């Protein structure tokens, strides 16, 4: 039994070190169907959900030299490890939580080498994603260019209209 726990601890330590970030969750009223649906939704954003024993997770955090506020860890503990953008994973958790009537509670998280409280993780999840921000910036640059093109197009069509009218009079 001791060897199994050691292997599990090593596996969790490896996941923590390989992940870009993680989100600590408490799950409530979580059926097998919800769990499968949740895991499938996370796979689209390069994240995975693990149900872990608290003691093993906290030992792995300690071994990794990380600090995470784990003061409110009553109930079942689940961790979302994000190998991609941790904000996208947080958004996915928030979306799933809205669809399934608050079956998940944000406890804490770690993103970009910063420890976050549950409320902070939830606030980050409500922000626009990196992809959405890029689209907004491109839109900001593209809007003036499209206006210039529209003005030039209307000037050219006005010139052509004048030439057509002059040609029609002769």
Swiss-Prot record:
The keyword Ribosomal protein applies. This is Large ribosomal subunit protein uL10. One of its GO terms (biological process) is translation. Part of the ribosomal stalk of the 50S ribosomal subunit. The N-terminus interacts with L11 and the large rRNA to form the base of the stalk. The C-terminus forms an elongated spine to which L12 dimers bind in a sequential fashion forming a multimeric L10(L12)X complex. Keywords: Ribonucleoprotein, Ribosomal protein, RNA-binding, rRNA-binding. One of its GO terms (cellular component) is ribonucleoprotein complex. Transmembrane segments: none annotated. The gene is rplJ. InterPro entries: Ribosomal_uL10, Ribosomal_uL10-like_sf, Ribosomal_uL10_bac, Ribosomal_uL10_bac_type. PANTHER family: 39S RIBOSOMAL PROTEIN L10, MITOCHONDRIAL. NCBIfam families: PRK00099.1-1. Forms part of the ribosomal stalk, playing a central role in the interaction of the ribosome with GTP-bound translation factors. It comes from Chlamydia pneumoniae. Belongs to the universal ribosomal protein uL10 family. GO terms for molecular function: large ribosomal subunit rRNA binding.
